[in-house]
Design a protein with these regions (language model features):
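Short arginine-rich
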Residues: 13-16, 268
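Short, charged, surface-exposed secondary-structure boundary motifs
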Residues: 165-166, 190, 211-218
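Short hydrophobic/aromatic-enriched beta-strand-loop microsegments
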Residues: 198-206
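Basic, amphipathic alpha-helical segments enriched in Lys/Arg and hydrophobic/aromatic residues
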Residues: 193, 218-281
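Generic, well-ordered alpha-helical scaffold segments in large soluble proteins
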Residues: 4, 8, 35, 52, ...
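Structured core elements
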Residues: 141-143, 153-155, 181, 203, ...
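Polybasic low-complexity intrinsically disordered regions
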Residues: 3-7, 15-20, 24-197
Length: 281
């Protein structure tokens, strides 16, 4: 980031620096982010920008789409005994009391999880199979509005947290439409009851009946929902492909700060897109 600030006029203008004036080095930028994290100011900044969007006419409209993605972090090489201590909730200093330098480099907040993906169709037209991919890191849970595609709410958890458990944390009640789209991970009796109680209409994908084939009517209904729900995947693709979202810090507080900053940056890019669209329209 230090190099980009020195190299790009657009970055200098955005940050308010004059051409040729002193600019912050990498260490200064890191310390500034640490201060923001300690003061819990990044979430406040995210909410302030969202309020700015609303006052300029970008209200949360058309319903909301909920999803989560795994944000990778450097893998930890721990023994079985150390893994057990981490799962028991011990801090790094408690797990490695005799080696404080090692403890300072250990992330005990991130978790392993299994990510499922579909294999390519085999030769001869055989059906696809699920591939289990072990992944380590944190999860970025978000809700976007269907009309403009801005991230309206986000929550960061460890990677093993179930997606459906965070529905209530990201769904807001100020959207002008009541519809809520999500994949099957979010469908449960408790989530459905909560949505109904708060005046939301569930557009969550329906699961295949246990022990039965998925009916054509169910497939068709889920396909209709997927056309809208797929928009949230574009958000994650932007963040990972164009913003290089990856956790290199230690601990969930710093991970939350990094992910929230990326979510904020995405909203800024999205605002530029809409403003240009309006100007050319």
């Amino acid at each position: 980031m230090e190099y980009l600030i020195r190299d790009r006029l657009s970055w200098l203008r955005f940050l308010g620096f004059d051409l040729g004036a002193p600019t912050p080095d990498a260490n200064t930028i890191r310390l500034f982010r640490e201060r923001l994290t300690e003061a819990k100011a990044i979430t406040v900044l995210f909410e302030a920008f969202d309020n700015r969007l609303r006052t300029t006419g970008y209200l949360a409209m058309g319903g909301q789409i909920v999803d989560a993605t795994l944000v990778a972090a450097p893998k930890q090489r721990n023994t079985q005994e150390e893994k057990g201590a981490i799962k028991a909730g011990k801090t790094a200093s408690e797990v490695w009391p005799d080696t404080p330098a090692k403890a300072a480099q250990k992330d005990v907040d991130a978790r392993w999880t299994v990510k499922f993906a579909k294999a390519r169709t085999a030769v001869g037209g055989k059906p696809q199979i699920d591939i289990a991919i072990p992944s380590f890191g944190y999860k970025n849970h978000i809700a976007i509005d269907q009309r403009f595609g801005f991230i309206r709410k986000s929550v960061v958890t460890h990677g093993a947290r179930h997606d459906g458990s965070q529905l209530r944390e990201v769904v807001t009640t100020d959207n002008t439409a009541s519809d809520v789209w999500a994949d099957t991970a979010y469908r449960s009796k408790s989530n459905e009851a909560w949505l109904t109680k708060h005046g939301r209409v569930s557009r969550i994908h329906r699961k295949k009946p246990r022990g039965k084939r998925r009916s054509e009517a169910l497939r068709a209904a889920n396909r209709v929902k997927s056309k809208i729900r797929a928009r949230v995947e574009h958000v994650f693709a932007q963040e990972k492909a164009h913003m290089a979202l990856f956790i290199r810090t230690i601990g969930i507080k710093r991970a939350e700060a990094k992910i929230t900053l990326v979510n904020l940056a995405y909203n800024m890019k999205r605002l530029i897109f809409h403003e240009r669209l309006t100007a050319t329209g």
